[in-house]
Amino acid sequence: MGVEVQRISPGDGKNFPKPGDTVSIHYTGTLADGSKFDSSRDRPGTFVTQIGVGRVIKGWDEGVLQLSVGEKAKLICTPDYAYGARGFPPVIPPNATLTFEVELLKIN
């Protein structure tokens, strides 16, 4: 259980976020059946959040810290690292494993 990081394309290999950093990310989230439930690319701008401090799901808090600036990866988050037994009705069902394709654009 946890988060699996599958690298798609490398980043700079030097600049990694630390807990508490604010990051700019593009992401697309999908359910196990491949259906998209959310994407920052469907909105203007990027998704900006503080990472590693509980502002986002645990899978992101741990997975994004492993990415360097410019890197693209899939974060596969088991339910305990996503929305758990409650899910996020009506978008995410209970006990859902979620996949996020994430691109770390910058550390702000």
UniProtKB/Swiss-Prot annotation:
One of its GO terms (molecular function) is peptidyl-prolyl cis-trans isomerase activity. GO terms for biological process: TOR signaling. This is FK506-binding protein 1A. The keyword Cytoplasm applies. GO terms for cellular component: cytoplasm. Residues 1-20 are annotated as: Disordered. PPIases accelerate the folding of proteins. It catalyzes the cis-trans isomerization of proline imidic peptide bonds in oligopeptides. Its EC number is 5.2.1.8. InterPro entries: FKBP-type_PPIase, PPIase_dom_sf, PPIase_FKBP_dom. SUPFAM superfamilies: FKBP-like. It is found in: Cytoplasm. It comes from Emericella nidulans (strain FGSC A4 / ATCC 38163 / CBS 112.46 / NRRL 194 / M139). It catalyses: [protein]-peptidylproline (omega=180) = [protein]-peptidylproline (omega=0).
